[in-house]
């Protein structure tokens, strides 16, 4: 009808690409706008899934964290918020590697329903709709934590309540990274078994790589090279296979991208109260790793070393004592009692500590 001149074609093609890009950006916001206009930009409540009974409301949430630190593109993650009108604060639970929001639902038992709202959510590449996403063991998961925390900060029923983080393993590291990047994200944190660097996690796993000959045990040749180049994309598949075999660290079930991350350094930016918990018998994260993270924290801090038998076992080894300690810390924060206490300290359970609390 109106034929283009040959010289105009490249410009028109560029214009078409720009329009397509803008449409893709706006398409991200369409679900949020259709779902709940009164919610915030970090996510929205799926109204048809909301349930309420006896003063308790359960909301299913769709979160929209950034895909990466250098991209404005968003991904979708799923969460579940259980809230009460009488709650004094909100807890954001950050799960560990190979878990999801339903696996950690049992942790809601730690927090009294009428006292705390609790939100669980799926980290990227975990749980619902994780296809095409990659786990980075805390680096990009910090963006998931930020989106979830900001959603709660802007929730109309929760925005005036303190927000606390509870994270274990990878979830604890992700919370550290998020808080170090945004100092007003949380009011306090409980961090169970965080590692001090991704390099140390890989190193501990590869230390199990040994061979035996004539009754003697030797380091398997090539172990140092695997450790040195563990973050290289061409080496990661081999590293994952080795870690699965020798260290029971199965990174093959979740799309994973090992990335350099240093929570012990990031912890130096944290000034809010932090309660660290760790098992003395943890074979994946050593006690000195957690001490390194603890020593870096700049605000009120406590470290409790338990007799748990393995990685993230403090809760399961002695649930009564664990629940008591966690509740006590959060109540001290809520009641403003920490200012009059020593600002740091390490408590270690006796080796002969009885299994049952109070025994």
Residue ranges: model-predicted function:
Residues 1-69, 344, 353-356:
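An N-terminal hydrophobic leader/cap segment in hydrolases
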Residues 135-156:
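Alpha/beta-hydrolase active-site loop
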Residues 309-323:
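Catalytic histidine-centered segment of alpha/beta-hydrolase-like enzymes
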């Amino acid at each position: 009808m109106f034929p283009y001149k040959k010289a105009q074609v490249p410009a028109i093609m560029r214009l078409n690409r720009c329009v397509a890009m803008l449409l893709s950006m706006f398409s991200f916001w369409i679900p949020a706008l259709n779902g709940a206009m009164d919610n915030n930009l970090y996510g929205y409540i799926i109204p048809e899934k909301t349930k309420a009974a006896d003063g308790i409301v359960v909301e299913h949430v769709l979160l929209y964290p950034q895909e990466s630190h250098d991209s404005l593109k968003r991904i979708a993650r799923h969460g579940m918020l259980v809230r009460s009108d009488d709650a004094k604060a909100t807890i954001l639970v950050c799960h560990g590697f190979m878990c999801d929001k339903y696996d950690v639902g049992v942790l809601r038992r730690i927090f009294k329903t009428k006292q705390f709202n609790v939100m669980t959510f799926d980290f990227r590449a975990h749980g619902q709709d994780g296809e095409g996403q990659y786990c980075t063991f805390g680096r990009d998961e910090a963006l998931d934590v930020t989106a979830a925390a900001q959603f709660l900060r802007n929730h109309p029923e929760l925005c005036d309540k303190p927000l606390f983080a509870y994270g274990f393993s990878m979830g604890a590291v992700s919370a550290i990274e998020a808080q170090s990047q945004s100092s007003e994200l949380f009011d306090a944190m409980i961090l169970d078994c965080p590692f001090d660097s991704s390099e140390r996690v890989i190193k501990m796993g590869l230390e199990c790589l040994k061979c035996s000959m004539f009754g003697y045990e030797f380091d398997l040749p090539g172990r140092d090279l695997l450790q040195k180049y563990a973050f290289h994309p061409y080496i990661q598949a081999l590293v994952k296979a080795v870690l699965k075999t020798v260290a029971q660290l199965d990174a093959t079930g979740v799309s994973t991208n090992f990335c350099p991350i240093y929570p012990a350094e990031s912890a130096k930016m944290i000034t809010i109260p932090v309660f660290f918990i760790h098992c003395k018998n943890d074979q994946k994260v050593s006690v000195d790793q957690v001490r390194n993270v603890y020593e870096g924290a700049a605000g009120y801090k406590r470290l409790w070393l338990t007799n748990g038998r393995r990685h993230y076992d403090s809760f399961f080894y002695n649930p009564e004592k664990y629940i008591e300690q966690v509740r006590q810390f959060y109540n001290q924060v809520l009641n403003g009692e920490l200012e009059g206490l020593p600002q740091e300290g390490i408590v270690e359970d006796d080796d002969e500590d009885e299994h049952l609390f109070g025994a």
